[in-house]
């Protein structure tokens, strides 16, 4: 769910997911999808593509369990869809951390209508 995703992003990046990524670029947060503005935005594009592959669970609402061991996210689920959902969220949180250097405040409140059409997933 969005709750676990936000928690993972905070653990990996030290940033509040809603304030920092809620409307960042063309792909982060709610709304459309478009050509990524930078590496940070590309993390969110890949994340949305990951969600599109899920079948049998709702990425925004369904809760899953994970643990934080030695500064590492460990997904733990018996349900295959929830495990994949956790892995999607883990991947974006790590990607955002790895690309903190590309985070550009000018894209923090980027208007989605100005986004160019993205390539399909």
UniProtKB/Swiss-Prot annotation:
Expressed by the venom gland. GO terms for cellular component: extracellular region. The keyword Disulfide bond applies. Gene3D superfamilies: Phospholipase A2 domain. PROSITE patterns: PA2_ASP (PS00119), PA2_HIS (PS00118). Disulfide bonds join 26-115, 28-44, 43-95, 49-121, 50-88, 57-81, 75-86. Residues 105-117 are annotated as: Important for membrane-damaging activities in eukaryotes and bacteria. It holds the Pfam family Phospholip_A2_1. It is found in: Secreted. InterPro entries: PLipase_A2, PLipase_A2_Asp_AS, PLipase_A2_dom, PLipase_A2_dom_sf, PLipase_A2_His_AS. Keywords: Disulfide bond, Myotoxin, Secreted, Toxin. Snake venom phospholipase A2 (PLA2) homolog that lacks enzymatic activity. Shows myotoxic and edema-inducing activities in vivo. A model of myotoxic mechanism has been proposed: an apo Lys49-PLA2 is activated by the entrance of a hydrophobic molecule (e.g. fatty acid) at the hydrophobic channel of the protein leading to a reorientation of a monomer. Belongs to the phospholipase A2 family. Group II subfamily. K49 sub-subfamily. This is Basic phospholipase A2 homolog blK-PLA2. It comes from Bothrops leucurus (Whitetail lancehead).
